[in-house]
Swiss-Prot record:
The chain crosses the membrane at residues 22-42, 63-83. It is found in: Plastid, Chloroplast thylakoid membrane. It is a multi-pass membrane protein. Keywords: Chloroplast, Membrane, Photosynthesis, Plastid, Thylakoid, Transmembrane, Transmembrane helix. InterPro entries: PSI_Ycf4_assembly. This is Photosystem I assembly protein Ycf4. Belongs to the Ycf4 family. GO terms for biological process: photosynthesis. It holds the Pfam family Ycf4.
Length: 182
């Protein structure tokens, strides 16, 4: 009974394998750059496979330290977005209460919880945007009164055309509203 009245789609957000992978790779690479730069400054081999006497501190060692620090900062930033689960949440379409609820986690602070609620009567249509090319975009939007369009698909790896079509059609049928393609 509740399945007929409530649909809930979970959104993964930043806790994707690719983010774990890139955070780890950037951390290892940046650590290597920083240790190599410090090795050239101290004239001590901090890494067993690097010969510090072959690297002059100014300018090569200094630049390597700079890139290492930048990489570590970026790696920590990516790690924190994973830890805080930024972008994850759910889309809930509730016929029982007559509400559409879009919930996402943001960065810590005053607006950490992004919680949008709309009456089902305010939802006018479902719009699908398909853009092919080098960076394809396949997005489903919820069109709400007041010319607002709220994306309800996940960010990251684009969904297949079949997945987009199926999810948009199911949602439009469930909400009994129009579906159009841009």
């Amino acid at each position: 009974m509740s399945e007929e009245l409530i649909r809930r789609y979970s959104i993964t957000g930043s806790r994707r394998f690719s983010n774990y992978w890139w955070s780890s790779v950037i951390f290892l690479g940046a650590s290597g750059f920083l240790l190599t730069g410090l090795s050239s400054y101290l004239n001590v081999n901090l890494l067993p496979f690097i010969h510090a006497e072959n690297i002059i501190f100014f300018p090569q060692g200094l630049v390597m330290c700079f890139y290492g620090i930048l990489g570590l900062i970026f790696s920590v930033y990516l790690g924190l977005t994973i830890f805080w689960s930024v972008g994850s949440g759910f889309n809930e379409f509730n016929k029982k209460d007559g509400l559409v609820r879009i919930f996402r986690w943001g960065f810590p602070g005053k607006n950490r919880r992004i919680d949008l609620s709309y009456a089902l009567t305010d939802v006018e249509a479902i719009r699908v945007e398909l853009q092919e090319g080098i960076n394809p975009r396949r997005t489903i939007y919820l069109c709400v009164k007041g010319n607002r369009e709220i994306p309800v698909t996940r960010i990251g790896q684009p969904m297949s055309l079949e997945e987009v079509e199926t999810q948009a059609a199911e949602l439009a049928k469930f909400l009994q509203i129009d579906l159009f393609l841009k």
